[in-house]
Amino acid sequence: MRTVPALLFAIASTASAQGAAADASGGSRRAKVPFGVGERMEFEVRFGRLKVGNAHMEVVALESLRGRTAWHTAFWVQGGNFLYRVNDVYESWIDAETLSSLRFVQELEEGGKNTTRKFEIYPERAVFIQTNKKDPKEEKSVPNPLDDGSFLYFIRTIPLEVGQTYDFDRYFRPDRNPVRIKVLRKERITVPAGRFNAIVIQPVIKTKGIFSENGHAEIWLSDDDRHIILQLKSRLSFGSLNLFLKRYYPSPNP
C-alpha cells in the first residue's frame, strides 16, 4: 500500500488556461475550468480483485490566499487491511487566475506512521518553502508550478490528442521534471458510476512507484469537456492497484 500516495503524481501542462469569468469575491479574472466548488468524485480502491478502501476528490472552496483567489481542493485515500492501514489527505490551493500552485499540504497516516508536509509555493519568484521543517528556507522551484493534487485538476482544462506525447516541466520540485504524458487511445468503459466514453493517458515521471519509467499505469478520463477521472489501473511487481469511480457529484454552482 506504500504506493497509494503516488496516485497523485500524474500530470502537468505547459501553459495556463485563461478565462473571462469574473471572480465573485473580487475583480480578478478566473481561468475557465470544468469544475467548481462542491464537485466531488468518489472512488473504490482495489488491490487486484480485493477491495481495500475508498478515495475521493473534492473542490472544497474558493478562498483568498496571500491576496489571490484560489481553488482549495482535497484528495482523501482511506483503506488497507489488518496488517497495513492508510489514511492520507492531500490538499492543494490553486491560483484561480493562473492555475499555479500556491500551497500544498500532505497529511499521511501509513502503517502506523504519521507524516505531515506543508509547502508554501511562490510562483512569482519560482521558489517554495517547506514550512514544517526545523529550518525552513527558500528552495528553487519552476515557473507556473503545480503540485501532486493540482496536476489532476489542471489536466482537465486542456485538450488531449490521441497519439501525442507531451513533456512538461511544471512540477514544483524541479528534480521531478519532466513529466511525460502519453495519450494512448479512446474507448468506452464501465465503472460503478456508469458507462462512459473515455480517453486513456499514461503518465511517466522521475520517481519510484506506479508512474516510474519501469512501471506501467493508465488513467481513464471522460472524453468530454469535464475530463472526469473515471479509473486508474496500475501493474506492479507484486500485483495491481486500481481506482474506480463509483459516484460523481457536479458542482451546484458551475
Protein language model regions, located:
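Low-complexity, intrinsically disordered/propeptide-like segments
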Residues: 10-12, 149, 163, 171
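Sec-dependent N-terminal signal peptides of Gram-negative exported proteins
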Residues: 1-17
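Intrinsic-disorder/low-complexity peptide segments enriched for small residues
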Residues: 5-9, 48, 144, 150
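Acidic, serine/threonine-rich low-complexity disordered tracts
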Residues: 19-123, 157-254
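Hydrophobic, well-structured mid-protein blocks that either form specific transmembrane helices
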Residues: 113-157
